[in-house]
Structure formats: structure tokens, C-alpha cells
Amino acid sequence: MAAKDVKFGNDARVKMLEGVNVLADAVKVTLGPKGRNVVLDKSFGAPTITKDGVSVAREIELEDKFQNMGAQMVKEVASKANDAAGDGTTTATVLAQAIVNEGLKAVAAGMNPMDLKRGIDKAVIAAVEQPKRASVECTDTKAIAQVGTISANSDSSVGNIIAEAMEKVGRDGVITVEEGQALQDELDVVEGMQFDRGYLSPYFINNQEAGSVDLENPFILLIDKKVSNIRELLPALEAVAKASRPLLIIAEDVEGEALATLVVNNMRGIVKVAAVKAPGFGDRRKAMLQDIAILTGGIVISEEVGLELEKVALEDLGQAKRVAITKENTTIIDGVGEEAMIQGRVAQIRQQIEDATSDYDKEKLQERVAKLAGGVAVIKVGAATEVEMKEKKDRVEDALHATRAAVEEGVVAGGGVALIRAASKIVDLEGDNEEQNVGIRVALRAMEAPIRQITKNAGDEESVVANNVKAGEGSYGYNAATGEYGDMLEMGILDPTKVTRSALQFAASVAGLMITTEAMVTDLPQKEGAGMPDMGGMGGMGGMGGMM
């Protein structure tokens, strides 16, 4: 086991504080409408230019191991805020730095660290209730656009495209961000249920220009097994042919004789039919087939529940207004399923999302909700260069998370005003002893840090602005973009309540642990091993000079 280097007390805290300040100083320059860029060197390709706090934090590793521990703890604050609300990483970092700096000053002056931490925790618990009370519901498109704009560093085009996407696919819809091919941002909306399985044979294509299969008002047969024998499908095919409507077969697979017969029937015009594989694998496939059944008002033909393919009747089949199938995707538009059944299924999946532990499972379940309840929108980010594309994509993703948080818990006045108001509401809070009172004051002072940093980045006088805003009430604040004072809600400067709350909670949590640190342990650097001895000359070769 390698030897360790141990530092105690003030020596440890000073080193840790240096690391905190290095990381926080790099991150906080990005805060606010006039936040600056940070350039990140990459081991390959062009450098990345970003205004995203968590991207900057993730890049920082310090050479001094004690300083690095401090930096990594603040990085944890940014990551936790990002995971919880998707935004507010820079605000959380600024708050953590302020609490640690003020708190360690008090510890150096001889205060009890544990009582300081209790005071800070008491102040934060009281403070996070204030934004919740002041929160305004964020339901209309204009407010959503404003939240997106603020989060994307005052880029209104980003706010507008996110608001448009949310309007089209609803709150439960899935919105993804991709790199586009054009200079302008584009929005693609897929209505209905789309899954990534295409036609099983190109001979099903009936729209030659688009290279797709278009079925109008089709029946949909859902089968939870492989089908290779055509005899199993004959009753369903005959029933559909009598009804003179097309048929879409979604099965685990359709192969051999069954597929060949379907192709021949389709080409001869006896019955208009197409077959695709069911989406997903294993249990997820069963669940998605059930989703499609509920959406289209059909049932899944599965031997597990005693349903046989040979005994299928028309009433067992699902229906939709239209189905479009390309080489890669199948889209079912306007299924005829009952609204109550669909809502019940959505509620059931939402419960599974709450119980799910892995992010991957949550993401897949969220996609299923979107396909049942709303739709899927894709924002294609446009830019002139690859460097700009990466920077803009980061901002769009941040803005998207912020708008989701705003829709979930509402919005409060932005620009650091919500924290100033929260601090003013709890200014009379008392701890159990004087040292806890100092902890409360540390937290209250730290809550001014975001507005001070926003003002500083805009090139204005931070103390003047902070005092003017403190003298006001409600949503009165300072618009750093224009240099004007006024009602932040009316000016459209909004922060999601969840983002403000999460930033303060995570910052105080990690900062409290750092204040109560008394020892730090790290590996000693490895000493260079002794090199191999020089190889001497070969003996007996000295007299060879005379042979020349």
C-alpha cells in the first residue's frame, strides 16, 4: 500500500479552499446575461468554447492533490444541481464558494464548525420554503420561452424554439437535441407513436417516390411471437380482405413462407398488407406491444394469455387513421384507443418511472409516456462551425432542462432576486447559540453572491446593485442585460423555482461538509525508481585498434 500524506486543521482547510476558489472562479465568469466564455482544450480536435458551468467544472483537475479534493467537492455541487434540475450549476457553484469562504473565516476565528453547519442548515431549510411560496405557475408559451431564453444566455431564438416544441408535443412529450445540417435551428415534430423498426420487405412499398409504405385507415394485428406459417395468419387476412381495408402486422418476426405469401398477396392487390418487427427486446418488447394495443384499441395475441392466432377476429385488431412505414421507422397516427385506457396506461408508466433506479430505465419509460401522451420533437441545432455547434448545443440542452423544471414547479424572479428575497424573509431567524447565529449569517451573506456575480460579469458595481435590490420588494430587481431596474417577472427574467431551490440545497450540503473537515489524506507522489546501472564495455576489446 502506498504511503499517505496527511494534513490537519487549518493547513488542510487552506489547501482545500484554494482548490474550491480555482474551480469556482473559472465557473462563475459564465454567470448571467453578460457571462463570459471559457475555452476548454481538448486532446483531439478544436477547443470547445462554452458558457455552461458544469462543462467547465468537469474539465478541471488540479496538480496539487489537496487542492484537487476541494475542487472535486465543488464539482460535485455542480453535477448534483445538473442532475436534479438540469440547470443552475453556476449558481450552485457560486453559492458553495461563498458559504465555504465565509464559513472557513468563522472557523479560523475559533467558532465551532459543527454549530456553524447547524446554523447554515437551519437557514437553508427556512430559505428554500420562500421561493416555493413566491413561485408562479409557468403554463403559457410566452413564459416558457422566457425561461428558455434566460437559461440559454439571453438567446431568444433558443427560448422560442423550445416553447414551440413544448406547445406541439405537450408537457409529457419527449424533446431531443441533435446537431443539424443547416445554419438555422430547425424543429421536427413526430406526431403519433413512432418506433425504430422499418418494413420487413421492400415489396410492401406503395409510395415509390418517398420509398415508404402508407396505409390509410388500417387494421393492426399485434403478435407476441415469430410467425413463419401462413396458415396461422389466414383467418385475419380473410377478415381484413372482406372489410376492404389494409392490414399492418407487428410481430416479433415474420419470416419464410408467411412473409413470402404476404408479399405475393400485396403485389397482386388481393389484400393491402405490410409487416414490421415489434420494437424493443424481451420484457420491454412485451410492454411496448401492450402500449400499441392500448393506443390502437386492439389486443396483443399472445399464447402466454391463451390467445391463438388462428382464432383472431376483427374486433381483436387495433385501428388507426394512418400508418407510415419507412426503411427505419414506423409511425402510427391517431390510434382509436379509448382516452381513459391511454391515461390509465400513462399513469401506470409514470409510477414505474418513480420506482426506477437507473437513468436508462427512466429515459426509456419517459419515451413510452411521450409516445402515448404527446409526441416527439427533435430540435436540430444550426451553426456555422463545429465549435459554435457544440457550444450552442450545450446551451439548448441547458435551456430545455430549465423549461422542464419551470413547468414542473413554476418560476420565480430571476437574476438572483429570489435568493435576496428569501434571505430578507428569514433575517430574524435565531439559532440555539451564538455560533449557530453566525452560521445563519454566513448563509444569508452567501445568498447575495449570485446577484453580485451577475452584476460583476456585466461590468457594474456589485454592492450598489445588491443594496438597491435589497431595498426593493417582491420581484423588483436588476436587469444586467440592459442595466435597468424593474419588475423581473414583467421583464421576462425568470428562474425555475426547482433550479433556485436545488442550487441552494446542494451548495449548502457540500459546503457544510467542507467547513467541518479537520483532516485530509492523499497518496504521496511515487518516487522515481533507481535506473538500471550503465552497461560497461565488453572486456578484451580494447586492443582491437591495432588491427586497422
Swiss-Prot record:
InterPro entries for this protein: Chaperonin_Cpn60_CS (IPR018370), Cpn60/GroEL (IPR001844), Cpn60/GroEL/TCP-1 (IPR002423), GroEL-like_apical_dom_sf (IPR027409), GROEL-like_equatorial_sf (IPR027413), TCP-1-like_intermed_sf (IPR027410)
Binding, ATP: 30-33, 51, 87-91, 415, 479-481, 495
Keywords from the named record: ATP-binding, Chaperone, Cytoplasm, Isomerase, Nucleotide-binding
GO MF assignments: ATP binding; ATP-dependent protein folding chaperone; isomerase activity; unfolded protein binding
TM annotation in the entry: none
UniProt-listed SUPFAM superfamilies: GroEL apical domain-like (SSF52029), GroEL equatorial domain-like (SSF48592), GroEL-intermediate domain like (SSF54849)
EC number of the protein: 5.6.1.7
Top-level lineage group: Bacteria
GO cellular component, one term: cytoplasm
Pfam families per UniProt: Cpn60_TCP1
Coiled-coil portions: none
Alphabetical list of Gene3D superfamilies matching this protein: GroEL (3.50.7.10), GroEL-like equatorial domain (1.10.560.10), TCP-1-like chaperonin intermediate domain (3.30.260.10)
Enzyme superclass (EC): isomerase
GO BP terms: protein refolding
Location of this chain's protein in the cell: Cytoplasm
NCBIfam families given in the database record: GroEL (TIGR02348), PRK00013.1 (NF000592), PRK12849.1 (NF009487), PRK12850.1 (NF009488), PRK12851.1 (NF009489)
Function: Together with its co-chaperonin GroES, plays an essential role in assisting protein folding. The GroEL-GroES system forms a nano-cage that allows encapsulation of the non-native substrate proteins and provides a physical environment optimized to promote and accelerate protein folding.
Quaternary organization: Forms a cylinder of 14 subunits composed of two heptameric rings stacked back-to-back. Interacts with the co-chaperonin GroES.
UniProt protein name: Chaperonin GroEL 1
Organism this protein belongs to: Vibrio harveyi (Beneckea harveyi)
